[in-house]
């Protein structure tokens, strides 16, 4: 089937390849600015939420174009590995509706709700891309240790309480997506 799969978040402002630029494992292909230190780069990346303000966002237009093109499904990145949530999650403030994100003052700042609503009205199958890794969560990438590859940066068997906190966090976010946004046909 022909469909529409969208990766979109604060990283789009800089033209970054999703959140891969903050993972040291992928430095060979991500074209990250290596003039500054990783720590400075990471801080700058996380602060992109403070300038993310997609005021021209028009979900009805997107859905109309997709329908006109003959698409049958829509999958949206609810959260990529960087942990930035494009919905009004209760689990973190690293989200589109955060008071630090200028878009939170928009009439309908929950981008996921607006997108899913527009595509559901047009009878699209709906998909939620949800990244289990969350590099912004202190229970995935702990500040106690250096960020490394794409995986948790601690030994789970030595810190089971941290992993349990992360599992609860993940469960709660998926529950929000499955219960607050209408029928979701695909979890990616």
Label every PLM stretch briefly.
Residues 1-188:
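Mature catalytic domains of secreted/periplasmic carbohydrate-active enzymes
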